[in-house]
Amino acid sequence: MKREILTLALAFGALVVSAQTTEKINIEDGERWWGAATGLGLSMPYGGGKKAEIDQRKYNLNNQTSPLLISSKGRGLWCSGPFKMKAEGKQINLTSDKGSFELQTYGKTLRDAYCGVMQKHFPPTGSVPPELFFTRPTYNTWIELVYNQNQADVMKYAKGIVDNGFPTGVLMIDDNWQQDYGVWEFRAEQFPNPKAMVDSLHDMGFKVMLWVCPFVSPDSKKGRDLAKKGYFLKRKGTDEPAVVVWWNGYSHVYDLSNPEARAYLKHEFADLQQRYGIDGFKFDAGDQCYYSEDEVDVYDGKSYDVAQTQLWAQLGSEFSYNEMRACWLEGNAPLVQRLGDKDYSWLGVRQLVPGMIAAGLQGYGYTCPDMIGGGSFTTFYGIDPDKFDQKLIVRSCQIHSMMPMMQFSVAPWRILDKHHLDICRRYAAWHSQLGDYILSEARRMAKTGEPMVRAMDYSFPGQGLEGIVDQYMLGDKYLVAPVVTSADQRDVRLPKGKWRDDTGKVWRGGRTITINVPIERLPWFERL
């Protein structure tokens, strides 16, 4: 009997091994690669001495992932499932338990590779998120209120926006407005009249979004009732609802492969819209790490890890005002994406441009570079309002101003002196002035599928710009070269041609220039 069991185990093991597919990319001289995960942005491009690795089934580095790699020499790789990748030296090694690899040459450039893979696997949808995301700043109550979301302070924050001369736009009320996780009703002690609050915010010129997640507190009545209906992930090998550990504790998780569970959750959100006039939702979580096939069972028997991430994003797309952080296989969908929480630090600032480029090259072009100054609330703890690095906040704001979207959270009027506040106000207005152009680029992306924020090598191949990660093109028109350190000077690589900068000076391209950048200035260059 033992021998039979051993034989069966060995046979099963052989099946598992045979099901795993592998691919090895030998990086050519001068070739660079992008892809796999937005969170690896600062490690891109691969092949220039940088190392990177990820296991897409297990984790996502707090952001979007996609089963693609694309190269500066026109090569593109697609996998029909999540893969494990290690990029080091002149090789990229990949394995997948759930998919097969397709490595193909689409042309000679990064743009050729992206467009080839994109048209084949996530073509343009023709749809774009609401224009307000692109034409006005977005605001989020997270850093100011953290877990103390309440009606009085939400209104105070909104009033601060208006009183300090910032444009109104989308306003997101973040985590802990609700009675409990999965109990999507305002906490009465914190929000005595939520309908009146939403009406007032609308009258002030805001659209209102609420934070939501796929978790449900196990010890709530809602959790117990929904568990009986079978709406949650099951503990592996049992009929009991699974309990997962996430950043706010222990919870059940909706199994969105169950059509009834999905319909129920969608109705919960739609009901908030009907009763309170809510415009949309910030869809947090959905990360594949909460849906491991090793730990849970799912309704349809197949939608594990990234498949549930995709189902969460698809639920988000049912609401026009949405925001995602985790995503899978929804390139070119009309989903607002956000870079994962960045620290209040200069490293956090340096991560913004590479992250935005990485997101765009996966098809996630309608993206916001996190929150101005950072969205990781713990890095704001213990700092007196007059002790913030004002230059860091301003430089972060400047980067946001020439991105598809910009998002404030920490209130600049609370932590900045008059001079630095004036600068932030000016760049919020500048973003609005660029609104028509940014919106036109968003609409063009909806038709062509090409990213709004582009790597220099994407727009200017063959000019040795593959390694440039601190400047970018916003559409075809603007080369943006923000300051991402505490210095007031930087080098700018100008592609061939003529360029007019933000001061009106015309430069001859095809060279590197060094420019002075006082705190008031965001360097940008218009192609002539």
What are these regions (language model features)?
Residues M1-T21:
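Bacterial Sec-dependent N-terminal signal peptides
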Residues P45, P167-A428, S459-F460, G475:
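Aromatic- and carboxylate-enriched substrate-binding clefts and catalytic-loop regions
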